[in-house]
Amino acid sequence: MTAQGQTLSGDTTLVLPEFDTPPEDPLALMRDWLDSAVAREIREPLAAVLATVDTSGRVSSRVLLVKEADARGLLFTSFQGSRKGRDLAASPTASLTFYWRETLQQLTVQGPVEVLDAGASDDLFARRPLEAQATTAVSRQSRTLDDEAELKARARALVEAGDPVSRPAEWTGYRLVPDAVEFWYGSPDRLHRRLRYDRPAETGSWSHRRLQP
């Protein structure tokens, strides 16, 4: 099969009335799309590409797991000293994009990013499996790795000890507060359906418009 034959190969039969009758609240629709992706057993439904920018305007992106999505925004975690953490400290705005190949849906959320307080970050850390907590405790994300075996051994020792693992002070939660949301549904004929919402800071109110493919 050619690469061309593998593109836009998902479900083209979804009924998505929001494109014809857009609701006023894009965040409720955002949660509906996320819940539907989970219900349809999409692979990695909460995996998203986070794009950040540094002070020189250089963009970087990476796939991560979104922990929660509600009316206040989207939660994710990172080390403050990582590339994304440094970017967000200097330019606290970002974009998260979900793509679900099985259903030909893409959801993009943009907006300012705020750092969660210690209590909220502790709660997020406590939800992680012990193995993930141990790796987080011994790692300094994005720093130079000199000895992989030694790093793994330190993480394994924490797991085997079975004691509670404390959240590293540098590991924190973030919330992306949406001020723009775009819903996209792909079509093999490239007549993709697009619905964009914007919430300007001056008004604080959502507006929406359909976009050409």
Regions of interest found by a model, annotated:
Residues 1-213:
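Binding-site signature for planar aromatic cofactors or substrates
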